[in-house]
Amino acid sequence: MQILFNRLEKVGFVFYHRTSQNGERVEDVFFIHPESKMLWRAFPHVLLIDATYKTNRYKIPLVQIIGVTSTLMSFCIAHAFVSNEKQENFTWVLQRLKHSLDSVMEPRVIVPDRDRALMNACATVFPRARYSLCRWHIQQNIFKHCRQSFKTEDKWRRFLYEWGELINSTTDHDYNYWYERIRSNLPRKKNRR
């Protein structure tokens, strides 16, 4: 871990870490580059937060925090390695992020992944922010849970087309149109008595 800290310091990152209660083990590490911090201060309105679970060599969750500029370009704000995927760990990470803002305004919109602990931590640290679910995660759930409801490939494809139109609607009228169209075409479950 000391090698990581030395490397972060060498390339100019600001970083924080916390250890276990007995001080024998590093639990969580948060790091932010000064240039990312400057962008974050200029564009604090939208946060995208994703935790990649155990995809690295050491099987440690990596939290990525991304910002969005006024021209819709994304930029990396910060990263954190956390020992557990619990609200306490995510809260600590988000508190470090908030601390890095000093007195700059807080995010208005946060798009977390669907992890309940992360969503609760966001609500704790940034209570005034609005939340939106990530389209990619919603789409994955549709593929996972809805496909079996459609008896034919044609009906499934029609649903996916209508779903795409719904989520890409640019007006309330279009949204309501596609919403009602999807509702009217959804398979109905028969009432059991």
Task: Please report, for each region that a protein language model flagged, where it lies by residue.
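Extended amphipathic alpha-helical interaction segments
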Residues: 1, 6-11, 15, 98-101, ...
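Structured nucleic-acid-interacting core domains from mobile-element enzymes and related host factors
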Residues: 1-63, 68-70
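Eukaryotic short linear interaction motifs
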Residues: 39, 55-57, 71-75, 89-90, ...
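Short, conserved catalytic/metal-binding motifs centered on acidic residues
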Residues: 49-53, 74, 110-113, 137
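Conserved, non-catalytic sequence blocks in retroelement Pol enzymes and Pol-derived host proteins
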Residues: 52-55, 81-87, 111, 148-150, ...
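Active-site beta-loop-alpha junctions of metal-dependent nucleic acid enzymes
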Residues: 56-58, 79-103
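A short, conserved beta-strand element enriched in hydrophobic/aromatic residues
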Residues: 65, 75-82
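Structured beta-rich ligand-binding regulatory domains in large eukaryotic signaling proteins
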Residues: 70-73, 86-87, 113, 126
